[in-house]
Amino acid sequence: MDKNFYKNSLNIFNSNFSMKANLSEKDKFYADFWEKNQIYQQILRKRRGNPRFILHDGPPYANGDIHIGHALNKILKDIIVRYKTMAGFYSPFVPGWDTHGLPIENKIINQIGSKSTLEIRRKSNDFANSQILAQMKQFKKLNLLTDFKQIYQTNTPNYEAKQLKLFKKMVSRGLVYRALKPVYWSPSSQSALAEAEIEYLEYRSPSLFTSFDIKKGNNFVAENDKLIIWTTTPWTLIANSGVAVGENFDYVRIKNGENFYVLAANLLEKLAVIFDWKHYEIIDNFPGKSILGIKYLHPIFEKICPIVSGNHVSLDVGSGLVHLAPLFGEDDYWIGRENNLEMVMHVNDDGKFNENAGQFSGQFYADSNKLITEFLEKKSKILHLSFIDHSFPHDWRTLKPVIYRGTPQWFVSIEKIKKDLEKAIEEIEFPENWLKKRLTKMVVERKDWLISRQRSWGIPLIIFYDQNKEPVLDKPEIFDYIISLVEKFGSRIWYEKTTDELLPEKYQNLGWTKENDILDVWFDSGVSFFAANISDEKPPFDIYFEGSDQYRGWFNSSLINSVIYFGFSPYKKLLSHGFVVDAKGNKMSKSRGNGVDPLVILSKYGCDIFRLWVANSEYYNDIVYSEAIFEQNVEIYRKIRNTVRFLITNLADFKPKKYELTEVDLYIFNKIQKLKNEIIQNYDQNRFVRVVKIINNFIIEFSNFYLSIVKDILYADKEESLKRRQVQYNLYELLQVLNIAIAPIMPTTAEEIYSFIQKNNKQISVHMEEFFKKSHFDEELDAKWDEFFQIKDSVYQLIEQKIKSKEIKRPNEVGVLLKTDSDFIKSIDLEKLLMVAKVEFSNEKTEILQLNWEKCPRCWNHFEKINKVCARCFEVLNEIVPEKNS
């Protein structure tokens, strides 16, 4: 008989499930399929009566194309939502967008110039809405399980009105107050900033040691003695109105040359080196409290200022004497208030000096450092000047340096709700305890929250001032009236109407004015738990999941707002992920030149491989993107796909039915149950990288052992043989498990696989299926097979030696004489399991037998020749062409 006869007699089937994925085409095909059949809506209807699981989407900013960080975040969330949905939960996912803020406002101002506030707001609103549509189109390419017709955005009248209801609640609880205090001020944005809007970048500052002359001494210091002062902000010396000492620190009066200096005793040796003092003399030693009240001459202007006590004085750096400019530092401010120091503001909103700066008027603050240093040099007041590179606060939007600057601002008191916040944090589940500490530090250690901004595009602070310029905070009916207008017309009404038109009739024509500031944009997004309609679900929601920078942002503002409004956290569990970095560990962004467009990646690899990269990343750290890492995930995908293709192809003639299994089939079936349990456990823990690794490792082990031994059965046994059906039963079980297991991560591939699976009660989509449940795993059965694998390893060491010495070409040529006393080992089909021609048992030693048997032309196994083919193939062929095989 010719070779084709033998080949055609084998159980070899073809499959339309191709090795090549063509994911880009299939992404579009299945996205259309899901939308046409309203799969998401069907899932929600099917699950509506089930337990709830809500992952609340933190709103990205509606400006520009989505970046790789956006894609990472949305995919991570989608994996959770898909898993929870398949696990039986009602889990609607409502995407949101944050729409107000400086980037959009600046973009509009650059386009149209300095127009009216109304025009800026109208254009900004239109632009934000257009950006939502653009980003929505891009997010759709990520195959998210959601309905983009059901979204929330922070610029709708209903959302804005709810936000102002929460603000009213803050006012009614006495948490909102106005004060002149130093706050982060961005000259580039010309607005106050909260801590959450600060980014620390490297910056070069002068390190200046100068001296202030004492005007009148006492028993410890004398007139014209020089106080040594250290500063990195010479521009603030204009606003100096005091010097702080540590009351209980030791200070010295020393003589160097013709001059007498005062400084902290502990810093003398260090400063003597810096100043190159080689022959100084200590004249006196005294505690800081001994010179409290001593007056000195201002370093620039002809005025006299006092020495006061300061708890913030440190002996780590400087001289132990701290220059105070009360409107340019928080500690300075409180010390200034306690000691009635002069509050000098010499910097305008744009960072330029006003008339209070005298001869330096009109200078930009940063440029004045050089001029002020030169001025002091001429007066022989500089002891040392150098420059330091250090981490310095910058505006997170413009990336320009910010300053502390005292301006009248609106605040929410955190001090008053500190205990409530601490209690709420105790109820939150964190994956790691240090994350709990991080949130606590970010929220609870704040004294207050700066909520006012001096911009146009945002939600107005709906506060009125009476005829005496005092804010009116005790009239709830006024707030209710404004909120009703905003709910009807949107927040633009505040700018379209006059003050009297915005007030209830009884408060009109009293000479009142309205506030011009807007609310912090973190206030906007931070009310989404209340203002957004999440399918009519109410907080607390199950999970908030954003980038790690949101501990100071959305996590922070949401927690504060919810505790104020509801008395509890808006989230039960908090998850965060790192930033996407390049192969060198640098954060990826367009500005750095190392940014990568997620849409380009999707076009090249397809959505499922992009999603696999996300799932296969340890997201709790920074996530590395590189071509090499993506190619690794391509290989993992290929391995999964090829395994699935093998399963589908070899199940072509299988009708789902339960079979009694042989020992090895039972062992593999048991392993599949363990696989299921581990997948469930890691999905429950949101450890997707472990899910991918568990699946990948299982496939490798499954292919190396089980598929190696059963291919012979699948291809060469009778089509209806019990052994073959037993193997197919395991293949079918694994195919179903893999199909469900990868569905949350690779929805397109899972849907394609599902179309090839035969089963009863089949759904229209795999994503409407239920996730498999935990199964019994027999540890005793699993452990029993350890003995076999030890024997297999020892046998194959001997076989490899034979192959290496070229005595044989492959294992199935040999026999094995096996030494064992194990009843279990003797009971299993060792010839199949070891893939050798013959196994016999020995009481002496294990050895390899060279048989010189014939190779079966049909199955290629080696056999002791009786017929043209081996006994098994003889039996199979005899049913096809009787008596022609002998």
From Swiss-Prot:
One of its GO terms (cellular component) is cytosol. A motif ('KMSKS' region) lies at residues 587-591. InterPro entries: aa-tRNA-synth_I_CS (IPR001412), aa-tRNA-synth_Ia (IPR002300), Anticodon_Ile_BEm (IPR033708), Ile-tRNA-ligase (IPR002301), Ile-tRNA-ligase_type1 (IPR023585), Ile-tRNA_ligase (IPR050081), M/V/L/I-tRNA-synth_anticd-bd (IPR013155), Rossmann-like_a/b/a_fold (IPR014729). It is found in: Cytoplasm. The keyword Nucleotide-binding applies. Its main location: cytoplasm. Keywords: Aminoacyl-tRNA synthetase, ATP-binding, Cytoplasm, Ligase, Metal-binding, Nucleotide-binding, Protein biosynthesis, Zinc. Its EC number is 6.1.1.5. ATP binds at residue 590. A motif ('HIGH' region) lies at residues 60-70. This is Isoleucine--tRNA ligase. It comes from Mesomycoplasma hyopneumoniae (strain 232) (Mycoplasma hyopneumoniae). The lineage of its organism: Bacteria, Bacillati, Mycoplasmatota, Mycoplasmoidales, Metamycoplasmataceae. The gene is ileS.
